[in-house]
A protein has these predicted regions:
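Short, contiguous alpha-helical
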Residues: 1-13, 17-19, 53-99, 139-178
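Residues that form generic nucleotide/phosphate-binding pockets
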Residues: 21-22, 33, 44, 85, ...
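Short, contiguous, helix-prone interaction/anchoring segments in small proteins
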Residues: 22-58
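Alpha-helix N-cap/loop-to-helix boundary motif
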Residues: 26, 33, 59, 63, ...
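Acidic/His metal-coordination segments adjacent to aromatic residues that form catalytic metal sites
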Residues: 26, 101-114, 146-155
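A generic "alpha-helical surface" signal
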Residues: 28-35, 65, 69, 113, ...
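Acidic/histidine-rich alpha-helical segments that form the ligand environment
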Residues: 32-39, 44, 102-139
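Amphipathic, soluble alpha-helical interaction motifs
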Residues: 40, 44-47, 51, 81, ...
Length: 178
């Protein structure tokens, strides 16, 4: 497999592109991505066989199950980061080791039902929360100490909408086709 093929498997929707300014209509579209994501993911996996959850989306990549558990972990973190940023002045968030978490017993279990339920609940609450934001609320920022950058909630929203699409394609790529 050459580097271009590997890059396509790693980033099936392309790498994340930072957006400095986000319009109200773009923000509405990004929130719609978050709102629709749990149902889209459920539809992708509803016809998975047990073996499909054990497949990786690329060589040395996570299994479909690990990706789904990662999504639950990551999106819980993001939702809480939004809440901290809304209620605190430029909080420093707590990063976590995604790779290590994916190897824990709950992150590598092939039964993904609990993580799908987490995503459904978190995304419902997250979107309900975002729907009440003003334009200025999205300008609030948090600091990511591992990356050493400040994220506005606009940027974080764009990142997590991309994250949904990115990993949805990974999960699709794990399905065994006859």
């Amino acid at each position: 497999m050459d580097q271009n093929e590997l890059e396509q498997l790693r980033f099936p929707v392309g790498r994340f592109q930072w957006i400095e300014e986000i319009s109200a209509s773009q923000r509405t579209e990004l929130i719609a991505v978050l709102r629709q994501f749990p149902e889209q993911l459920k539809k992708v996996v509803e016809n998975f066989e047990a073996a499909d959850f054990k497949n990786t989306y690329r060589p040395d990549g996570w299994t479909a199950a690990q990706v789904i558990h990662h999504l639950a972990d990551s999106h819980m973190h993001s939702y809480l980061r939004f809440k901290h940023t809304y209620t605190e002045d430029t909080p420093t968030i707590t990063p976590y080791d995604e790779g290590a978490w994916s190897c824990l017993s709950d992150g590598s279990d092939h039964d993904v039902q609990a993580s799908l339920k987490i995503l459904e609940g978190v995304h419902h609450r997250w979107c309900q929360f975002l729907d009440a934001f003003t334009t200025e609320d999205f300008d609030r920022k948090y600091y990511h100490p591992q990356l050493k950058i400040y994220f506005s909630l606009n940027q974080a929203l764009a990142l997590y909408a991309w994250h949904c699409k990115h990993h949805l394609e990974h999960v699709k790529n794990c399905k065994i086709t006859a």
